[in-house]
Amino acid sequence: MMEKKKALLLGDYTDAPWHPLEPARVELEAILGEAFELTATEDYDVLLRLQTEAGGYPLCIAYTDCWNRELTKAQTAGLLRYVAGGGGLLVIHNGISLQCSYELLQMIGAEFTGHPPYQKLRYSRTAEAQGHPLLEGVEDFVLDEEPYLFAPDPFVERRIFLEFEFEGNRLPAGWEHDYGLGRVVYLQPGHHAPSFRPAPYRRLIRNSASWAAAGRVESTLG
């Protein structure tokens, strides 16, 4: 049996205005449990130790709901060091609330600008990303979800692999890019537990976690 990799899930149990961590934790444990040993926490100070903890975490998953507060400078620096040094960062839905720090906004690759009402959305793979390992075994899918909208960071070369249809337009719903020696993936769906249940999206989450985690494995970190 292949040894499981360690993954850190960061979110908010007690101070989550819209997206509490526990429902997402249950779903992610079911999706990733065969390949990852998942540790969930709402202690943002864990970011200070990501580079140095014994054994380390090849993957950090952000499901943070910190829209109304900023990370400390030390917490921000810890996450930046971790990813630049080879750690993988998977940001799901409201995890983009880390944009409260402009440095983290740039690392994620875009700014959340708002969302129209919750509604049925059709998600599809982009033509440009056909053959990307993130899309292996992933079919198009339909999901009731919050249509998060974004303004791209002009200095980040994102590779968009997932889109959703909204008012006659096809808009980004998933992208990836390198950051130093690390890899960053953003996935838009994830408002609540049912968001995680379509089989194609579960496969996409598994692919994204494995792909992002490989950045650290292939880095020069000791």
Indicate residue ranges for each PLM-predicted region.
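Residue-level preference for short coil/turn positions at secondary-structure junctions
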Residues: E3, G55-G56, G85, Q130, ...
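A glycine-centered loop/beta-turn motif at secondary-structure junctions
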Residues: E3-A7, A16, P152-G222
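Helical hinge/lid and interdomain linker segments adjacent to catalytic or ligand-binding clefts
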Residues: K6-L10, A16-L98
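Residues at the C-termini of beta-strands that transition into short coil/loop
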Residues: G11, E42-Y44, H93, V138, ...
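A structural signal for well-ordered alpha-helical scaffolds and beta->alpha junctions
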Residues: L21, R25, S101, A127-G131, ...
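Short, glycine/charged-enriched secondary-structure capping and boundary segments
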Residues: E22-R25, A74-G78, L104-M107, W175, ...
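Catalytic beta-strand/loop cores that center a nucleophilic Ser/Cys/Thr
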Residues: V26-E27, I31, A35, Q106, ...
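A glycine-rich, often tryptophan-bearing local segment used as a flexible ligand/cofactor-contacting loop or short
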Residues: R69-G137
